[in-house]
Amino acid sequence: MIVTGATDLETAAPALSETARAKVNLTLRVVGRRADGFHDLESVVAFADCVDRLTLTQGAELSLVAAGPRAQECGQTADNLVLTAARLLGERIPDLKAGAFALDKYLPVAAGIGGGSADAAAALRLLARANGLSIDDPRLIETARLTGADVPVCVRSESCVMTGVGESLLPLDVPAMPAVLVNPRVPVATKDVFAALGLRKGQLNVGVNDLIEAIVWPEAGAPVDDWLAMLSDGANDLEAPAIRVQPVIGEVLARLRSTGARLSRMSGSGATCFAIFDDEAAAHHAAQTIRLDRPQWWVHVGTLGGGS
């Protein structure tokens, strides 16, 4: 049950706000496809400094309005993961206090950077604050998992190794790295990319010895070069099938790799790709070059990793 409909404005709680940071898969291994059809993954995840913003006005009827440059890409409001997460949490917590959500949408949709999952995670953090819950509350964790595979990692918005179908998170101290994110403004459906990968139910994709979970990652405070050396040994197993689904992803990667980046790769199931640079000046120069060549593309220059 979700409690709504407070009418006493003098006792109404103030609006609460959260940012929803873009999730970037620095590596992504598809371990295999389970008998239930889901894919087991292992991924090094970091978060970027580009965000959506979500506000909760407590006491109002549960609802969602979207604004901002990407609002029209969100689709039907009733299907939005923000409301899905709120309803699922309400099923698990009697008398959950919710309200009206307002989303300022800046991140591209169906882009491989977990925009919808980050929004849902921000909604759960807002509801936790409004109801005095810890983000470690088992009911909130269960809700995050049921809402979507990327939602648990987005609730914390901290660098980690994510395994399984998103349920296992191992924190990592990934340093802040100058980066450019590029999306060609072409949505890519995750199901289409996994279909192009073509694993059968029960089929493994990599051997146990290849799993990144067993890797000893650099310790806290290790230089960026140590991280880039290890990340460069990784890959995104969905990159090739995603390029078959949307060939423009190959062009995005080629342009990023032509800018002198230390590491370039696709995030998630695409189409967003990222590149990491030696310094901010190199990142800004690369972003400006790509914007001039492809003004219709979404380009963000900023930071990957580091603190929240």
Swiss-Prot record:
This is 4-diphosphocytidyl-2-C-methyl-D-erythritol kinase. InterPro entries: GHMP_kinase_C_dom (IPR013750), GHMP_kinase_C_sf (IPR036554), GHMP_kinase_N_dom (IPR006204), IspE (IPR004424), Ribosomal_Su5_D2-typ_SF (IPR020568), Ribsml_uS5_D2-typ_fold_subgr (IPR014721). Keywords: ATP-binding, Isoprene biosynthesis, Kinase, Nucleotide-binding, Transferase. The active site is at K23, D150. Its EC number is 2.7.1.148. Belongs to the GHMP kinase family. IspE subfamily. It catalyses: 4-CDP-2-C-methyl-D-erythritol + ATP = 4-CDP-2-C-methyl-D-erythritol 2-phosphate + ADP + H(+). The gene is ispE. Catalyzes the phosphorylation of the position 2 hydroxy group of 4-diphosphocytidyl-2C-methyl-D-erythritol. It comes from the Bacteria. The keyword Kinase applies. It comes from Nitrobacter winogradskyi (strain ATCC 25391 / DSM 10237 / CIP 104748 / NCIMB 11846 / Nb-255). Pathway: Isoprenoid biosynthesis; isopentenyl diphosphate biosynthesis via DXP pathway; isopentenyl diphosphate from 1-deoxy-D-xylulose 5-phosphate: step 3/6. HAMAP family: IspE. GO terms for molecular function: 4-(cytidine 5'-diphospho)-2-C-methyl-D-erythritol kinase activity; ATP binding. NCBIfam families: ispE (TIGR00154), PRK14608.1 (NF011202). SUPFAM superfamilies: GHMP Kinase, C-terminal domain (SSF55060), Ribosomal protein S5 domain 2-like (SSF54211).
